[in-house]
């Protein structure tokens, strides 16, 4: 799998039949450290509801200055990413609540549907981005079903002007109705999907970061900027504990 490069002449050729196949990282790394004491959130706040946008344009859940920073490079059309979302989030929330661990979600865009969803989950408040991503992963198979059922409309979207193209993709995939039922109005979505400058930024950030960090698969995880050779929560949690996110 190669990162998707944005083009105003993009061909809508997402490999839908293969999109649920698991992908994973291929580099190694481990960290070891002393126990890190919990870090209190500022008065009137809690880390589980704290979201910031990083310099890398990722969405960080938790303490932005957490000593342990877990980063996921994810695709919204990756079945393994959907599985991680379903199995890992309760555990991640527990670690984030301590202030010791933050969880940052970054995009590794692999196809036009992925880029469309990546745009839509960023369309509202930053606090909702990861939640909307999780909901989109839960709906992944239905999204593929919609595109396959509406393939003519999906392909026709590629011939639309740039500011209409991703609206066409979203309509063919059933995403406008899906996100409208989850708090993003249809007009709000269309405005975001017509913003080709923002869309190009998402795709270009994905491509440049993948090249700079040598990331070629999703999901890929970094812990304190060190690439991990695992991609499941059952493998990641022990690494967090070894790095200091554990009790005495």
Model-derived segments and their meaning:
Residues 2-6, 10, 16-115, 207, ...:
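Extracytoplasmic thiol/disulfide redox context detector
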Residues 2-6, 24-40, 166-248:
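C-terminal cap of thioredoxin/glutaredoxin-like
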């Amino acid at each position: 799998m190669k990162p998707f490069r944005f083009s105003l002449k993009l061909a809508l050729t997402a490999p839908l039949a293969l999109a649920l196949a698991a992908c994973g990282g291929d580099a190694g790394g481990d960290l070891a450290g002393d126990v890190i004491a919990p870090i209190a959130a500022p008065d009137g706040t809690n880390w589980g509801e704290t979201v910031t946008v990083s310099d890398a344009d990722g969405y960080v859940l938790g303490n932005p200055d957490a000593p342990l920073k877990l980063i996921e490079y994810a695709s919204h059309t990756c079945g393994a990413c959907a599985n991680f979302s379903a199995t890992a989030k309760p555990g991640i929330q527990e670690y984030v609540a301590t202030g010791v661990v933050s969880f940052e979600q970054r995009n590794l865009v692999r196809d036009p549907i992925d880029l469309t969803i990546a745009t839509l989950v960023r369309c509202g408040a930053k606090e909702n981005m990861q939640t909307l991503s999780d909901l989109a992963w839960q709906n992944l198979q239905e999204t593929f079903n919609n595109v396959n059922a509406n393939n003519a409309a999906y392909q026709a979207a590629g011939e639309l002007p740039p500011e209409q193209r991703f609206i066409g993709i979203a309509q063919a995939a059933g995403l406008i109705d899906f996100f409208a039922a989850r708090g993003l109005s249809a007009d709000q979505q269309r405005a975001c999907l017509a913003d080709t400058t923002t869309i190009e930024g998402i795709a270009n950030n994905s491509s440049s970061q993948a090249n700079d960090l040598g990331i070629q698969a999703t999901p890929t995880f970094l812990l304190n900027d060190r690439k991990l050779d695992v991609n499941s929560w059952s493998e990641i949690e022990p690494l967090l504990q070894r790095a200091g996110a554990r009790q005495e």
